[in-house]
Amino acid sequence: MKKKLINFNNSLVLVVGDLILDCYWYSKNHYMLSEQLTPIVPINKIKEQPGGAANVAKNIAEIGGYTKIVGFIGMDNEGLILKKLMDHIRIDSDLISIKNNKTITKIRILSEKKQLIRVDFQEKYISNKNNLLHQKIIDSISSFKILVLSDYAKGTLANIQNIIDLAKKMSIPILIDPKGIDFKKYSGASLLTPNLFEFEKIVGKCYRENEILQRGIKLLSELQLSALLVTRSKNGMTLFQKEKKPIHFPAASKIASDVTGAGDTVIAIIAASLATGYSLEEACFYANIGASIVIQKIGTETLNINELNSVLNHQ
């Protein structure tokens, strides 16, 4: 594939989904309190990052695209922190604060670049404001070229089929990063981007390459998708499209320091690429390169357009 300098300055992407605050507590070392067998972890640094759907929006903003995010947060300090983080990187946000809910927060404690434990607050957003969420999507969607639905199974996309139907009526492509064991709710999407683990939970364990190909083609048809992209970590990614042969993109890097957020990077680059006018094959090629960059970083990290172009020019 021909390589060139790319930019996503004209991309307009609406993101809807589960917003999460990712917190990283770093320690240079940890030790055991011998008499109680209790681990002691002195914290040297704390870092907070947009996570979940907010990380998708962050990825789009960092590579130069314009994005707006719609979703829920809690009425708490964590929600304010998340909103401030997104404002800082020029993400337009239209958020609904929910009473008696905490902003979904994940705290990862790391020592010597290894994660020791993850602590989660608030399992799901519990809200009666789904109609308000849908109205906010209606108010915004006509200004965007692509819709991304980022599903972390945290409750925001409870009425996802209604959102898909709305976007289809307006001829706006719908890209979905799925979660869970019910993929039927994603029927009719333009593109679904499960990782191999998520894919196998739906179609069964795949022991051979031809099983992935056969079951991918079948799932594409069953869900009436325009395309299906299965991300496969060190084995790259495989794209299925209607009436086309599957296309495999070998992994651009076999080195992975941390795969956290890599799926967000993939769908963000694809969305920005399609919104700019690149083909789906080009979009997946760029996303594959982008994922190879972020998995070499620790935590929920993004990349910028200069990093992406630098790697492209050395392919």
From Swiss-Prot:
GO cellular component terms, A-Z: cytosol
Keywords (A to Z) from UniProt: Kinase, Transferase
Enzyme Commission number(s) from the entry: 2.7.1.-
Highest taxon of the lineage: Bacteria
CDD domains in the cross-refs: RfaE_like
GO MF annotation list: heptose 7-phosphate kinase activity; heptose-1-phosphate adenylyltransferase activity; phosphotransferase activity, alcohol group as acceptor
Pfam hit, one: PfkB
InterPro entries reported in the protein's UniProt record: Carboh/pur_kinase_PfkB_CS, PfkB_dom, RfaE_dom_I, Ribokinase-like
Record bears the keyword Transmembrane: no
Family: Belongs to the carbohydrate kinase PfkB family.
NCBIfam families: rfaE_dom_I
Protein name: Uncharacterized sugar kinase BU060
